[in-house]
Amino acid sequence: MLNRKNKENIISKINKITKSSLSILIVDPTGITSNQMNNLRKSSRKLNVNIKQVRNTLMRFAIVDTEFDCLEKYIKGSNLIAFSHSHPGSAARIFKNFTKENNKIKIKLAVFERKIITDSNIDYLANLPTHEESVINFINIIQEASIKKLIRILILINNNK
């Protein structure tokens, strides 16, 4: 049984994790085996995602005065909380891939930029491009625009002759 001091330590740790998070994903862990949970934790470490199972009351106290305080009324039942630190869609990607292999898990909702994202719209968060993907897309757009301009100039020169 947790005493008051232990609970306060848990709340402060979760609060620190929450404040450094870009997004939070809440999942119903019912039906996940311990081996599957270990695999989830391994894959989450690679993408800088913390996965925690915290008592609902302690989680409600931990999110007070953070950008995730809108979650308070949704923290009910059995929950697995995933905190994304480096990219807002990391946790969503991990669990979307996991649900393809395991139908037992259910993504409840996510929070990104103080907005609740329901399970039906989780793809929005999971498909957000990473920083590297955004840079590559931007470079490709610039290259395409440059090539199109060069072709137009060559056509104009050819037409003027």
Curated annotation (Swiss-Prot):
InterPro entries: Ribosomal_uL10, Ribosomal_uL10-like_sf, Ribosomal_uL10_bac, Ribosomal_uL10_bac_type. GO terms for cellular component: ribonucleoprotein complex; ribosome. It holds the Pfam family Ribosomal_L10. CDD domains: Ribosomal_L10. One of its GO terms (biological process) is translation. The keyword Transmembrane does not apply. GO terms for molecular function: large ribosomal subunit rRNA binding. Forms part of the ribosomal stalk, playing a central role in the interaction of the ribosome with GTP-bound translation factors. Belongs to the universal ribosomal protein uL10 family. HAMAP family: Ribosomal_uL10 (MF_00362). Part of the ribosomal stalk of the 50S ribosomal subunit. The N-terminus interacts with L11 and the large rRNA to form the base of the stalk. The C-terminus forms an elongated spine to which L12 dimers bind in a sequential fashion forming a multimeric L10(L12)X complex. This is Large ribosomal subunit protein uL10. The lineage of its organism: Bacteria, Pseudomonadati, Pseudomonadota, Gammaproteobacteria, Enterobacterales.
